[in-house]
Regions:
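Domain-level detector of nuclease and nuclease-like folds
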Residues: 14-199
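Glycine/proline-rich, flexible active-site/cofactor-binding loop segments
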Residues: 1-20
Length: 199
């Protein structure tokens, strides 16, 4: 699919209570960081997907080194390596807030996460069982760290977020996937030191 031109502004989501605006982030020192990436959403769902990716409800405040380096690397790996190698890959992602997290200096309505998580889950095939891989990445990263440095268990993501993942799976599969770190199945070492696009 052709690449769609990137919009100049993010749009307020009328469905949200706080109605966060593009300008709430102006001069805050934080990027408007995508949770679901524009590249993947526009590639899979065209203009409608891109429009959804530029809603402010898909945005979290991210430090530049986090957003433009480490997170960009991980997003690129998921679309250019995980998806082609493992077929359909489910991605669960979001912010993690600390006990004493701050708010943007430019808008009290926007809380700043201390870290972000990503969980990848493959669908099983006749030759390959379901696999899962989880990351928790602090905002303080410099950007070029090995991806494996931040691999964790899904159960640890649950402990930090208070969320319960993979609830539709049978109990044994859920327990196995959530309690295991499985780097080998994902061939993560092949892309472990992928360089950021923005250096």
């Amino acid at each position: 699919m052709f690449h769609l031109k990137r919009p100049n502004r993010f749009e307020t989501d009328w469905r949200s209570l706080n109605r966060i605006d593009h300008d709430d982030y102006a001069r805050s020192g934080y990027d408007r960081g995508h949770n679901a990436p524009n590249y993947a959403m526009s590639r899979l769902n065209g203009r409608a997907g891109q429009a959804d990716s530029f809603l402010m409800t898909n945005i979290s405040p991210q430090r530049p080194n986090f957003n433009q380096k480490f997170w960009q690397r991980l997003e690129e790996v998921e679309i250019t390596f995980f998806a082609p190698n493992f077929g359909k890959v489910w991605v669960i992602t979001g912010p993690i807030f600390g006990q004493n997290s701050q708010r943007l200096s430019t808008s009290w309505r926007v809380e700043v996460p201390t870290a972000f998580y990503k969980i990848y889950v493959t669908e099983p095939t006749p030759t390959r069982p379901m696999a899962a891989l989880a990351f928790v990445v602090p905002q303080t990263v410099k950007g070029k760290e090995p991806l494996t440095q931040f691999v964790t268990r899904i159960k640890d993501v649950e402990a930090q977020t208070g969320l319960n993942f993979l609830v539709d799976l049978d109990d044994k599969t859920e327990t196995d996937l959530e309690g295991t770190i499985d780097v080998a199945s994902w061939q993560l070492n092949a892309v472990n030191k992928t360089l950021p696009r923005y250096r």
